[in-house]
Amino acid sequence: MPKKMNKIRVLALNAAAVALCLLMLAAAGFAEGRSLDRGSSELGFWGGYSPDNPTAIGITTNRPFGELNLQYAWVLVARDNWALKYMIELVPVAVISQPRQTNVVQGNFLVQVDAPGTQRAIYGAGISPIGLQVNFRRHRTFQPYINGTAGVLYFTDQVPVSGSSQFNFAVGWGAGVQIWYRENQSVSLGYKFHHISNANSASRNPGVDSNLFYAGYSWSWKLRR
């Protein structure tokens, strides 16, 4: 197996270990709790990994994907039992594992297919300036949430196939739980359906979907007036 593929698997194992540590940390101090109030801010980070690719929107498979995000959030609305947050995320590191392409003859056509044994890591970075999250049970320690984000990613090579593009749009939506183990500190565990596509800006646009499982940490504050 290629060394870069091994690095991705090690990254996934490390992410799982971090998630377990965060969960244990939350369990150790879960009695503190937190109430999300309008105007409060959060700063944090999360990392996620997708070992496989569904084909709900994109049609490309065999593309394990992972990313590390830095996140800022601000509570826009706070009601009795829920709160709405605006989010912006920076993606300093994104990595997708994809094989090289080779040309084969199928009938009267020359088509590109994945070349076996050529899996390699392609790195990228980006930003998601559009993001919303709704936290339920906003006065409780364990707060389920749903969220969605939209942004762009730029890779060092064409993704997810040759003839596509280094520049891709990225959208994602999902759910999770935010655990306030201290009044101003929390960990999050969640799932996000993630899709990247060049929106037909290149000759090929098969798109790629990911089942992104992630864990994160955030620190919250509210300026006093």
Predicted regions and their residues:
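Cleavable N-terminal export/targeting peptides
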Residues: 1-37, 222-225
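Predominantly the C-terminal beta-signal and adjacent terminal strand-loop region
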Residues: 34-39, 176-225
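Short loop/turn motifs that connect adjacent beta-strands in outer-membrane beta-barrel proteins
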Residues: 31-41, 76-85, 137-144, 181-186, ...
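Short glycine/proline- and aromatic-enriched beta-strand/turn motifs that initiate or cap beta-hairpins
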Residues: 29-76, 210-225
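Extracellular loop and loop/strand-boundary signature of outer-membrane beta-barrel proteins
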Residues: 55-59, 113-119, 157-163, 199-205
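Residues that define the transmembrane beta-barrel architecture of outer-membrane proteins
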Residues: 39-41, 62-68, 121-128, 142, ...
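Gram-negative (and chloroplast) outer-membrane scaffold detector with strong preference
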Residues: 66-158, 218
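Transmembrane beta-barrel strands of outer-membrane/channel proteins
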Residues: 41-51, 86-94, 146-152, 189-195
